């Protein structure tokens, strides 16, 4: 060996261990030494003979990296000499860390040699040595075997039986806990070898499964020995077990979860170990959700997590630490338990998690233990994201709990309540804001009396959330004192973080107030404009300063939507220019805010915003093409190439990061692109091709933008359709034999269609599948079958239907990616709300197709009938409800051309008359009414059982009686059930009044009017009322004063809707159509004519009502 070369290498390595000239030494190693095969024997020589242990260890680490690159370039005699000497020094080296470096080099060489059967005696000899008398020798042999298994080569498969026999013995070694831990880790890698085989050997799988209790014993031993490092390593093994084929894990997964729960709740155990246990349970929910749900472990997990969440925390840190990032990443048992509750509530049905949390509210909130009171409020705050519908149904318990929290004498409980309200408003928005009268005085009082900056901040954030969603007609009485308060808060705080929260609250007040904000608009801009001056100059600004500037942009644009174009006009151009400056800065957050500003202004100015397209769109395209992934490496291309050659997979991964800031920026830029396309219509056409090209790349390659990019693609398609004067929902019904849009428009639709369908069958991200189906459902509903087929080609329609069918059967890739072979599908388990959403959107595709295809849909539905009707029988209320609701909508789509009337009617009547869920019964009533309306066959046999069921529903004493019957019935569900039942009765009476006892039916019907939701059901109700008046039926004429009251309420709501449409913030009332009291102008005219008739017939009775007097004037 060249001694000079060896000396130079050793000196260079020494520079790294000493830290002197580190960068130069690293570059020298990469470029001058590691490219030469002779470096490998030299490094091994230093490993065995180096001057100090740190040098030896570094030489071993570097040698291991070079084995795969240079080993086969070394002559055979040198290779043989190295193998012999390494085995000798591995066992004779006194220092453990050097022994381990030596062992890993042996393992790397073994991986190279074993594949060609060039070192056949290595494994047998090590297995024999591992069974020897000397503890250190056994440990070293097992460590080498473990390192070999860790490097993973399929040539080790021939030794699986020997490994299982050895490690099943050494895992119980009485003299060394380290040997036991290494054996457990080695067994983990053996499991990968067993799985790697073409067919899993059942005997080997059984032997491995039998070793799991021994792994658990090792975990118990290392915990008792306070060996946190080994405890972590064993938990890593358990996490890997979750990914194994169920043949290898047997029935032990449930036992492992229960063991982890015991460890998690044991406060005597080291905190880090308890966190590992909680993280294991989170992993089990991720990878073995079906097993957890099937075993009904959710309640046990929830109770344990609540117990851990109640543990004492550092109160001072909680109240004064403004670092929210640190809070989210904190790994204490308490914080990990809250994260577990958050994950469990999103993965498991509400019956297993959210309902358990709600059950614990009374006891925990009344506890003398302040940490229990804090924990239950935080538990509610995380449960709402995973189970919003269930939490909404429990508002009678949850709202009082949060109010009690706000009134609590302990600041940390107040803080938890504020966090809870913030999260509730995030997920349930206007439903929470309905309680503004209870919340606002308490929150303002907390702001006024806050002694801790975190409480002040969260109180402002909670205020912000409430203000944003307070109803338009409720905000007015608060505006004047609130705006004065917010201006004062802005002036009296120097902290950018706190000012940021206040600015958001001002924006939210504007959002809620709409045109009522105009008197405060100029003053608000005066207060805020100083935060966005010299927008491009950000040098020296803190993150909070930049966030304040960005937040100000976003909220001023929200004000623009509130006060609308005329009031905003004088500020528009200078602020758009400032936003353009923001987009050109180096700050991703400022660029993001600039795009948000542009998106809002496009909403306000629509086609008038077109002049800005030529400057804004190139910046949007530039942003969308930014890399979300970064490879962090200091050096030139030559250095990078050298590093890539020598680095292992782990080192390469460590250099690779995802920039979430860029992802957020791209998401907002994509949303801005949507608004510009929809707002500027034909002015956007020159940019369509480039938009689709860039967005398609994002759907294929992006880390966090795929769903948003796909939504934007369809918004671009929509803008093209609107620009070509295609009116939504005015397309030819049925299968299109040709194209009813021009060729250019069709080409854009086809491109979007291809993108959406491209990987749908193999898509494993549930959120992406939901997005694809939502987009298809929305676009087909608005623009017809051309969205999915054209010119007689139904191949894409068939492909989409196949994917919808697989979702409804539960066999789509996104539903089976974590499927567990030993867990049968169990319909007794309620669906999680995410699963329910997936089924909902799949059914919504069918509903849209039925509307677009009308009678032609019957051919499509024939394949779906068994699955849809099968869902009627599901034990999951969510699945039953959405399936019954969808079937009812399908009846509406097919109308008189429905060949399945008898079958659908029979199935829906069973649900109406027997289902325990009010929501399901209400949905069934809707469908039964429609089927009766459109049936061409004799359906008189269903009248008696259906009317009996409807009377029971409509005659319920009050809403509380219904709520007591079905604990999950929200006010919305109750109102919807009333509307559907009323509409059903009216349709049946219109179809065959002889079969309906009108004397009893009409008073019961009128008792539930006016409707609070489901206003489309007014159509048959109004038709029935008019028909009865035409017949001069005393059943209705005797009710004339009541009819006047009802129509007065209807026109009041219609007037409110029109006022809301004119005065509320642009885009706030997205479902304005649902508030329409009359589905057509024709129906409105007919009602007005009826009112005029009643006024004449009944001595001016209608004119006496001030609302209706204006209507008939």
Curated annotation (Swiss-Prot):
Any one GO CC term of the record: cytoplasmic stress granule
Record-linked InterPro entries: ARM-like, ARM-type_fold, HEAT_type_2, Importin-beta_N, Importin_beta, TOG
Localization per record: Cytoplasm; Nucleus; Nucleus, Nuclear pore complex
Keywords in alphabetical order: Cytoplasm, mRNA transport, Nuclear pore complex, Nucleus, Phosphoprotein, Protein transport, Repeat, Translocation, Transport
Residues annotated with Phosphoserine modification: 646
Gene3D superfamilies in alphabetical order: Leucine-rich Repeat Variant
Organism: Saccharomyces cerevisiae (strain ATCC 204508 / S288c)
Disulphide bridges: none
Described function: Functions in nuclear protein import as nuclear transport receptor. Serves as receptor for nuclear localization signals (NLS) in cargo substrates. Its predominant cargo substrate seems to be ribosomal proteins. Required for import of the ribosomal assembly factor NMD3. May be involved in nuclear transport of YAP1. Mediates the nuclear import of histones H3 and H4. Mediates docking of the importin/substrate complex to the nuclear pore complex (NPC) through binding to repeat-containing nucleoporins.
Additional comment: Present with 38300 molecules/cell in log phase SD medium.
One biological process term in Gene Ontology: protein import into nucleus
Single GO MF descriptor: nuclear import signal receptor activity
Name the record gives this protein: Importin subunit beta-4
Domain (Importin N-terminal): residue spans on this chain: 25-92
Complexes and interactors: Interacts with Ran (GSP1); interacts specifically with the GTP-bound form of Ran (GTP-Ran), protecting it from GTP hydrolysis and nucleotide exchange. Interacts with RPL25; this interaction is dissociated by binding to Ran-GTP. Interacts with YAP1. Interacts with histones H3 and H4; via their NLS.
Mapped HEAT repeat ranges: 3-35, 40-74, 92-115, 120-147, 157-191, 208-244, 252-287, 296-348, 350-384, 388-428, 430-469, 472-513, 515-558, 560-605, 607-680, 683-737, 744-783, 790-856, 859-894, 902-934, 942-991, 999-1030, 1049-1084, 1085-1110
Stored SUPFAM superfamilies: ARM repeat (SSF48371)
A Pfam entry, by short name: IBN_N
